[in-house]
């Protein structure tokens, strides 16, 4: 029997591992009626640039697909192009702009965009009240005290 005065004695029998695994059942953890299988062919979007399309500043039908309504070059994430394709498209757009095939900005759409944004801003923005508040009695009295103190100090 173990008492508080006696030291703890280790048992002389070695620790034996159980021969049974932790989980007694041999069935898998989750049993689905239909096992989940990944499709063999992954879903792929059709590339925006076909194999026959030439990326060139004269190919306006191709270039117009990669420009926003305001005339800006769309990002690679939006275009879903490879780095090489995006670089070639960007160069072609810049060449077309310089050679005046393309405008630098699409002013028609930009004017509509500005008109909409201005109407939204002016409609919701509160106007600042620019009138000067009248001086209160407390403010006047404090100002008079300061003026009196200045006059007294200048008299000395």
From Swiss-Prot:
One function term, GO molecular function aspect: structural constituent of ribosome
Main subcellular location: plastid
Keywords from the named record: Chloroplast, Plastid, Ribonucleoprotein, Ribosomal protein, RNA-binding, rRNA-binding
Family matches, as SUPFAM superfamilies: Ribosomal protein S18
Top-rank taxon: Eukaryota
Skewed-composition ranges (Basic residues): 13-48
PROSITE patterns named among the record's database cross-references: RIBOSOMAL_S18
InterPro entries: Ribosomal_bS18 (IPR001648), Ribosomal_bS18_CS (IPR018275), Ribosomal_bS18_sf (IPR036870)
Any single biological process term in GO: translation
Pfam families referenced in this protein's UniProt entry, alphabetically: Ribosomal_S18
Region (Disordered): 1-54
Any single GO CC term annotated in Swiss-Prot or TrEMBL for this entry: chloroplast
Gene3D superfamilies from the UniProt entry: Ribosomal protein S18 (4.10.640.10)
Location of this chain's protein in the cell: Plastid, Chloroplast
Keyword Translocase: no
Self-association and partners: Part of the 30S ribosomal subunit.
Assigned protein family: Belongs to the bacterial ribosomal protein bS18 family.
Protein name listed in UniProt: Small ribosomal subunit protein bS18c
Gene: rps18
